Regions:
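Fe(II)/2-oxoglutarate oxygenase catalytic core
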Residues: 1-127, 131-157
Length: 157
């Protein structure tokens, strides 16, 4: 990746950590992942997707670091695909509800956030803490392409 593009990404990650009041310290970038989601009308599930997951793990990587921040940069034009929405579960509201209800069943759907349409614009940049649950909904037409990255730092203490 050209140095000037990597610098713009690094600046964006640092600013998001400040703006989001996350203050995650990081000093290592994992290899970027070029991700293609295709519409597959012949398949049982008609489009590529990632189901709910986090990018973080309790495991420390061989380099002594762990994932702290994640990002995705949109490489497709918005009219090149349908579906493929980036979604996340708003952690604070859900965790507060879990604490107040104990073992009661909770409708998690009310805590799901969907990135605005502007996030589908080519070049849009979504940055979030790696522990946030997120997914990409199935692509229902065309092809969605993104560049995904993870930023490592020392384990939390």
């Amino acid at each position: 990746m050209p140095a000037e593009i990597q610098q713009k990404i690094t600046d964006g990650i640092n600013q998001a950590s400040i703006d989001g009041n996350w203050m995650h310290q990081w000093d290592h970038i994992e290899n970027h992942q070029y991700t293609i989601y295709n519409h597959r009308p012949e398949a049982e599930v008609t489009g590529d997707f990632y189901t709910w997951h986090t990018d973080a793990s309790d495991r420390v990587q061989p380099n002594g670091k762990m994932r702290k921040l994640s990002s995705t940069i949109q490489l497709s034009e918005p009219d090149e695909y349908e579906g493929g929405h980036f979604q996340w579960i708003e952690p604070n509201g859900l965790f507060d509800k879990l604490k107040s209800t104990g073992t009661q069943t909770i409708d998690v759907d009310q805590y799901i956030q969907t990135a605005p349409f502007s996030a589908k614009e080519k070049g849009s940049f979504i940055i979030f803490p790696s522990f946030v649950h997120h997914q990409v909904s199935p692509v229902t037409r065309g092809r969605r392409i993104s560049l995904v990255s993870w930023y490592h730092g020392n384990p939390y203490v």
